[in-house]
C-alpha cells in the first residue's frame, strides 16, 4: 500500500512515488554502466578528474536517459488523456509520460526522441529567458553598488561619506589576493616551517604571548585559528615567531587597497554566476511536500526585496519535551495549520434567500483535531449577523432578513473562509525527522503568530521571508538572514561566491535601517545625484522633478562624472596631486 505523505493528495503522493522510483531506476542503470568501465576509459577519466561531465553523463551514454521533465514535472497528458495518439488513454506506463529507457549509444526510439526534444526545447527557452533576466539583475546591481569604494580608514562608504561597512568583509581581505577567502593557510605555514625547525618545543605560555603580540591586527576568528593551530604544532619558540611574522606579512599583503571600487567588483561577482543558474522551481530532493523557489528567480526575489516571497516557508523546531515525539509534533502541527470552515465540510446547501446549511465531515474534523463546537465558536466570533443552529453533523445559519441570491452566495463564501483555528497564511504543514528530532516544515510564513503556539522552540524558527524577519526581529536579524539566503541560493546551484560580496550587498540594502531593494524603487532611485538617477531609468521625469525642486549636482559619484567627462573619484581618481612650484628670483 502507498504511504500517504502529509500535505499531499492521493494523486500527488502517487506521482511523487513514481517519480522517485523512476529516478532510482535511472541511477541504478547509470551505476551499473559506470561500474562496467575500467579506470583507463576516457569518459570515466574525464568525469573522475573533473575535467568535464559527471557520472550522470556516463549513465545517460551507456545506461538510460531517464525521465524527461517539463517545468519540473513529467510530460503532461495534453492530448485527450494521453501524451501522444500512440498510447492508450490514461495509460499508467512510464513510457507514455516521457521516461526514456534507451541510452545515447544505442539511440532513442521515435517516441523517446520526441519526448527528449520536448525536454531539450525547455532548456533552450530557459537559456534565452535567463540571459535577459540575469543581465538586467546585474545592471541593477552595478548601478546600486558602483559608487562604493574603500576609504583610507578601512571603511566602505558612498561618495557622501555614509558608512556602509566599518571594515570591508569584516576582515578587510581582498578576495582576489586571498586563498579561497583566507589571507593565508596557517597549516601550510606551520608545515613548511616544521621541515627546517629543530629547536625545543615552545610552551603554551610562550606561544600565547607571541600570538598576542602579532595578532592585534587580525580579526578575532583568524586570531583563534592561528592560536589553535600553533598550540597543536610542535614548533620551537623561534619557529612560532617566524610563522607569526610570515602570517602577518601575508595578511598585510592580502588587504584591500584604499580607493578600490569594491562595489563594482561585488556587483559583477554576484551578477556573473546568475547566467549559470537555473530558472525553474524544483522540489526538494526526497521531500516532495513543498515547492521552493530556487536559482535565479530566488536570487532576483532577494535583491529586489520583494514584500512576499513566491513560496514562503518556515522550519519550526520544537521544545525539548516535544521534539522527540512524533505524536506531540503532529499535535503542534495541527495547531499551526490554518484551518478554514471550507476544509471541514463535505457540502453546503442553501435556499438562496435566508438559510445556509453546512454539512460537516467527521473525518476532516478528526484529521484537523476540531469539533463542531470549534466551528460554532468561529462563526459566533466572526461578527456576521445570523442565527446558528447546530444539529448532528450540520449547522444551519439563518439570515435576519430575506436577501437576493448574490448576497446569500457572497455570505456563504465569507462563511467558508472563516478561520476555525491555526496560523493565518500557513496553508500546509509537514513533519520531517531530522536526526532524532521532529521538525515542522510549512508552506506559508507568519513568525509573529507561530510564536504564540505552545510547544515550539521560540529561539529556533526559520523563515525565508526577510521582510517578516525585519518586522519582528529587527534589521540586524534581517541582514543576517539575507546573507544566509543569498549564500544558500548560490551554493545550491554549485556556485562559489565569496561571502564578502554577499555581505556588502546585504549591508547596503539594510544600511538605512530598513530593507531597500536594489532597483529604481530602492537604492538606485534614492541616490543623491540627479544624473545618476536619470541615467538608470525614468530619465525625463527625474530631470524635470529635480529642476522643479532646484537640486544641485555635486558630481561625486561614478555615472555623473562619466556623463560630464570628468575624472571618476575611485581608484587612482581618489588622489589629488599638489605640486609646489619654486619660482626663480
Where are these regions (language model features)?
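Non-transmembrane, amphipathic alpha-helical segments
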Residues: 10-17, 43-46, 50, 129, ...
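Intrinsically disordered, low-complexity regulatory segments
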Residues: 110, 114, 123-131, 137-138, ...
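Gly-rich Lys/Arg/Thr-decorated short loops/hinges at beta-loop-alpha junctions or inter-strand turns
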Residues: 91-95, 119-122, 310-313
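General helical secondary-structure elements
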Residues: 22, 134-135
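Extended, well-ordered alpha-helical scaffold/bundle regions in very large, multi-domain proteins
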Residues: 1-42, 48, 54, 58-112, ...
Amino acid at each position: 500500500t502507498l504511504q500517504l505523505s502529509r500535505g499531499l493528495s492521493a494523486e500527488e503522493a502517487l506521482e511523487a512515488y513514481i517519480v522517485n522510483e523512476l529516478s532510482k531506476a535511472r541511477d541504478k542503470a547509470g551505476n551499473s554502466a559506470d561500474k562496467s568501465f575500467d579506470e583507463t576509459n576516457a569518459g570515466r577519466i574525464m568525469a573522475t578528474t573533473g575535467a568535464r561531465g559527471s557520472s550522470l553523463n556516463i549513465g545517460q551514454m551507456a545506461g538510460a536517459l531517464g525521465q524527461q521533465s517539463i517545468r519540473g514535472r513529467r510530460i503532461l497528458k495534453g492530448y485527450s488523456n494521453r501524451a501522444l495518439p500512440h498510447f492508450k488513454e490514461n495509460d499508467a506506463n512510464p513510457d507514455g509520460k516521457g521516461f526514456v529507457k534507451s541510452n545515447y549509444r544505442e539511440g532513442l526510439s521515435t517516441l523517446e526522441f520526441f519526448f527528449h526534444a520536448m525536454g531539450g526545447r525547455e532548456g533552450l527557452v530557459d537559456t534565452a529567458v535567463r540571459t535577459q533576466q540575469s543581465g538586467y539583475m546585474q545592471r541593477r546591481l552595478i548601478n546600486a553598488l558602483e559608487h562604493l569604494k574603500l576609504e583610507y580608514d578601512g571603511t566602505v562608504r558612498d561618495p557622501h561619506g555614509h558608512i556602509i561597512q566599518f571594515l570591508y568583509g569584516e576582515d578587510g581581505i581582498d578576495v582576489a589576493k586571498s586563498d579561497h577567502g583566507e589571507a593565508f593557510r596557517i597549516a601550510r605555514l606551520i608545515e613548511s616551517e616544521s621541515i627546517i625547525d629543530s629547536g625545543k618545543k615552545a610552551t603554551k605560555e610562550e606561544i600565547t604571548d607571541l600570538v598576542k603580540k602579532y595578532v592585534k591586527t587580525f580579526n578575532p576568528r583568524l586570531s583563534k585559528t592561528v592560536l589553535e593551530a600553533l598550540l597543536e604544532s610542535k614548533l620551537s619558540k623561534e619557529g612560532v615567531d617566524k610563522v607569526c611574522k610570515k602570517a602577518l606579512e601575508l595578511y598585510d599583503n592580502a588587504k584591500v587597497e584604499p580607493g578600490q571600487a569594491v562595489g563594482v567588483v561585488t556587483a559583477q561577482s554576484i551578477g556573473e554566476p546568475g547566467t549559470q543558474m537555473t530558472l525553474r522551481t524544483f522540489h526538494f530532493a526526497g521531500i516532495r511536500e513543498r515547492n521552493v523557489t530556487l536559482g535565479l528567480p530566488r536570487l532576483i526575489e532577494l535583491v529586489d526585496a520583494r514584500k512576499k516571497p513566491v513560496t514562503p516557508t518556515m522550519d519550526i523546531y520544537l521544545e525539548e519535551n516535544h521534539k522527540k515525539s512524533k505524536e506531540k509534533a503532529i499535535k503542534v502541527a495541527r495547531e499551526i495549520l490554518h484551518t478554514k470552515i471550507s476544509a471541514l465540510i463535505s457540502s453546503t446547501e442553501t435556499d438562496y434567500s435566508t438559510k445556509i446549511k453546512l454539512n460537516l465531515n467527521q473525518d476532516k474534523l478528526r484529521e484537523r483535531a476540531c469539533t463542531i463546537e470549534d466551528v460554532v465558536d468561529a462563526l459566533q466570533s466572526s461578527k456576521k449577523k445570523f442565527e446558528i443552529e447546530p444539529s448532528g453533523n450540520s449547522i444551519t445559519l439563518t439570515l435576519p432578513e430575506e436577501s437576493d441570491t448574490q448576497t446569500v452566495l457572497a455570505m456563504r463564501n465569507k462563511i467558508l473562509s472563516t478561520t476555525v483555528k491555526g496560523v493565518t497564511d500557513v496553508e500546509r504543514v509537514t513533519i520531517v525527522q531530522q536526526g532524532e528530532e521532529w521538525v515542522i516544515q510549512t508552506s506559508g510564513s507568519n513568525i509573529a503568530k507561530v510564536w504564540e503556539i505552545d510547544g515550539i522552540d521560540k529561539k529556533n524558527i526559520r523563515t525565508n521571508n526577510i521582510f517578516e524577519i525585519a518586522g519582528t526581529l529587527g534589521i540586524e536579524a534581517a541582514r543576517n538572514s539575507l546573507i544566509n539566503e543569498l549564500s544558500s541560493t548560490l551554493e545550491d546551484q554549485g556556485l562559489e561566491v565569496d561571502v564578502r560580496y554577499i555581505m556588502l550587498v546585504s549591508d547596503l540594502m539594510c544600511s538605512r535601517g530598513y530593507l531597500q531593494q536594489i532597483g529604481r524603487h530602492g537604492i538606485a532611485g534614492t541616490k543623491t545625484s540627479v544624473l545618476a538617477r536619470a541615467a538608470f531609468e525614468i530619465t525625463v521625469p527625474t530631470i524635470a522633478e529635480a529642476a522643479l525642486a532646484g537640486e544641485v549636482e555635486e558630481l561625486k559619484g561614478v555615472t555623473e562624472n562619466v556623463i560630464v567627462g570628468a575624472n571618476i573619484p575611485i581608484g587612482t581618481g581618489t588622489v589629488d596631486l599638489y605640486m609646489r612650484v619654486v619660482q626663480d628670483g
